Amino acid sequence: MNLVLPGQVVARGAPNGEGTVKRGDYIISTRTGIFDPEKNSVTYPRKVEETAVLPNVGSIVLARVSRINARQATVNISVVDDVCTKDEFQGVIHVQDIRATEKNKVKVQNSFRPGDIVRALVISLGDGSSYFLTTARNDLGVIFAQSSETGEQMFPVDYQHMQTKSGYTEMRKCAKPILDE
C-alpha cells in the first residue's frame, strides 16, 4: 500500500474503486490517501497524533487554496513530503512564483481558485506566519480542482486548462500528472 496524491495515476486497465476515477485506461486518485491495489481504492490516512513534520526549504507540499488576490494565493498546507501533518500550515504563492516563464503575463485568478489542491515547492521559510511556495516547475501546480461554475471535478487537458467530463473548461496552472507505471 502506497501514499497517493490527488491526480496521481494509481493503476491501469482495471475497474476503479472508492476515491478514484477512471480516465481512459488509467485509474486516477481523487484524494490524498493510501492506495489498496486489491480494491483499486484510496482510503484516507489516519493523521499521526505525534507527527512532527515541518516544511523545509525544498519540501514538496500539498495544499488547499484558501483565498486569492491579484498578488498572491494563500494556501493551507496539509501534506509535507508525502506525510500528512497533524496541523495545517499557512503558505503563500506570490504571482512571480507561479510560472517559470511569462511571469509578467501571469494572473493569480487564472492560475488558482479557492478550493483547488496544489502541489508546490517550499522556497523559503517565509515571514513568520507563512511559508513561501512556488509552482514554477512542470510537475507543480493544481492537481485537483472542481469547476467554479458546475461543481464538477476537473482534469488537466494541457498546462493551463482543466476540463470537466461535460466539456466545461477553466484556466489553471496545471501540474504535470505523475505517472507510476
Swiss-Prot record:
It is found in: Nucleus, Nucleolus; Cytoplasm. Its main location: nucleus. InterPro entries: Csl4 (IPR039771), EXOSC1_C (IPR019495), NA-bd_OB-fold (IPR012340), S1_domain (IPR003029). Gene3D superfamilies: 2.40.50.100, Nucleic acid-binding proteins. One of its GO terms (cellular component) is nucleus. SUPFAM superfamilies: Nucleic acid-binding proteins. GO terms for molecular function: RNA binding. Keywords: Cytoplasm, Exosome, Nucleus, RNA-binding, rRNA processing. Non-catalytic component of the RNA exosome complex which has 3'->5' exoribonuclease activity and participates in a multitude of cellular RNA processing and degradation events. In the nucleus, the RNA exosome complex is involved in proper maturation of stable RNA species such as rRNA, snRNA and snoRNA, in the elimination of RNA processing by-products and non-coding 'pervasive' transcripts, such as antisense RNA species and cryptic unstable transcripts (CUTs), and of mRNAs with processing defects, thereby limiting or excluding their export to the cytoplasm. Belongs to the CSL4 family. Component of the RNA exosome complex. Specifically part of the catalytically inactive RNA exosome core complex (Exo-9) which may associate with the catalytic subunits rrp6 and dis3 in cytoplasmic- and nuclear-specific RNA exosome complex forms. Exo-9 is formed by a hexameric base ring of RNase PH domain-containing subunits and a cap ring consisting of csl4, rrp4 and rrp40. GO terms for biological process: exonucleolytic trimming to generate mature 3'-end of 5.8S rRNA from tricistronic rRNA transcript (SSU-rRNA, 5.8S rRNA, LSU-rRNA); nonfunctional rRNA decay; nuclear mRNA surveillance; nuclear polyadenylation-dependent mRNA catabolic process; nuclear polyadenylation-dependent rRNA catabolic process; nuclear-transcribed mRNA catabolic process, 3'-5' exonucleolytic nonsense-mediated decay; nuclear-transcribed mRNA catabolic process, non-stop decay; TRAMP-dependent tRNA surveillance pathway. Residues 58-137 form the S1 motif domain. It comes from the Eukaryota. This is Exosome complex component csl4. Signal peptide: none annotated.
